Each structure stands twice: as C-alpha cells, then as structure tokens.
C-alpha cells in the first residue's frame, strides 16, 4: 500500500512521491551538466501541474544555472503570479534581478520574501542576498 498522496491540481493523477522523484531527476540531470534532459523533465512537470509555482521555480533554477538570467527572471515571475504568497518565488525573482543589475527591484523582492515567511529557508537566502548587496558583491 502506498503512503504517498495524490497531488491536487494535476492534469492527470500523479502521486506526491512520483512528482518528487521527477523533480529530483531533473535536478540530478542539471548537476550532471545535462540541461536538455533537465529541461525536458521540468517541462513535463510543468505540463502535469500547470497551476503550480513549483515547476516554474525548477525552470528558474535551470535557466539560472545556464546563465540565462532573463529567462530565469521570467520563470520566477510566473511562479510569483501563480503563488504570490511564496517566499521562495519572491527570493528567486530577487536573485535574478540582482544578476541583471536591477538592484532596487531586487531589494523589493527580497524584502517581500523575508516578510512572507521570516523564518523560512527562502527568507534566509533572501537575507544572504541582501548582505551581498550591502558588501558590494553586485555593484
């Protein structure tokens, strides 16, 4: 008997465990320097969950790793549109904006991430990016 639950909002029935495995596979391919395979997996998850920010954040990470900062920003912004309450999505927007040298906009997104979930890993990441701004990393 499976202890995994079906994922709500999926276009076809898929269990949480299977979705997690797909995402982990996509990240593994990314680590193995196989971005095409990673993109195929993340795009497949996006097709399964068209209303979830999770695949958008995965695509953000993929584009970011490839140095495609405008595409990373677009995916992160789409994640925010899908879930405005996601600190991770706001932090991802802030990070992409920093690498595009759009510091004032980045600060706004980072502050939003921190205010949404102050004790979360996303907020900690946003705080670290704010510190990097302060010491001139993105100048």
Kindly label every feature range from the protein language model:
Residues 13-14, 47, 81, 118-121:
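Structural signature of alpha-solenoid helical repeat scaffolds
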Residues 69-104:
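Mid-chain, well-packed structural core segment of small domains
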